Amino acid sequence: MFFGDTLDIIFLSFVAVGTFIALINVFLSIRKPRVFGSHGRRTKRWLRISAILFFIYMAISLSSTVLSNMIWGDGSYRDPANELQVLGTTIGSLSFSAIVHAQLKLTFDLYDKDTSDNRNKSFGLFMSPQILNLIYFVVTHIRLYAENLPSRGFQTVSNVSSITFMLVPFFIWVASVISLVFTLIYAARTQVPVPRGAFGCLLASSILSVIRHTWLAILNILYFVASRTNGRLYLVFPDYFSNISIVITVWFAALCVLLLIVGSSKGLRGREPWRDEYSYGPAVSGYPPLEPAPIHMTSYGRAY
């Protein structure tokens, strides 16, 4: 049986709304992939990945929220709600990195900067927090299930879990800031024509992402500092704080994915390599049409 006051019900409703938006994002990214055109295949792939991962994260968060308010939860660290929270935190960090990675991919595709060097940079920004994320998942489950650890070993595992839990959002915040910087630099310096709607959606998604990850990074640092003071420092937030936090952490992320999908449909559609039936030579993207073929030549370059 579920119990809770009005604020708990509002919190659960906010999580449910975020889950619904995440489901819409999955539908839009999978149901009609042709709306993006054939350009930017990596962007479309990462949009689908980020949308699916974020929906899984929201489904786990919704289940964990309901489960933590069930009467039969024993409140111990190993109860089902806490196990779901650890899994949700891990998948959530993976989905947030994927969203930032999709932002970078869309930026590179819109401004024709999808070079090998940029791909390596974006992949490095994606993998750096995920290495820490994997460490967090492993050591937290060691703490969760290894009951026979000596006290010193248990303390070491707890410290590693706390440190990685703090560092993962910080690394993702760094990646989100770099993504925003790339967007602003390419928009100011390149001459590639980009539809205003696509640039506006990309910029809005990047700004929301920076705000969201700044919020999370600050909160995690505060929690880490409080946990290191041996109880001398307590963080006391108003009752409605969790509802504000869920809007920033969940709704902003869902809107980021939705804005990226809309921006991709506006910016990537119609950017396929140009080819005309009266032209010959390779198809070229971003350049004027080739001269018409001579009248004695067919469109395949063969004489009559």
PLM segments and residue spans:
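Membrane-proximal first intracellular loop
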Residues: 1-117, 190-198, 235-240
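Residue-level signal for alpha-helical transmembrane segments in multi-pass membrane proteins
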Residues: 21-28, 64-67, 102, 136-139, ...
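Cytosolic juxtamembrane helix at the C-terminal end of the final transmembrane segment
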Residues: 30-33, 103-117, 145-150, 181-194, ...
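Extended, charged alpha-helical interaction scaffolds
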Residues: 131-189
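Extracellular loop 3-seventh transmembrane helix
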Residues: 5-19, 77-96, 155-176, 196-277
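Helix-to-loop junction signature of class
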Residues: 57-75, 135-151, 209-230
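The cytoplasmic-loop to transmembrane-helix boundary for the fourth helix
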Residues: 109-140
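Intrinsically disordered, low-complexity terminal tails of fungal membrane proteins
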Residues: 262-304
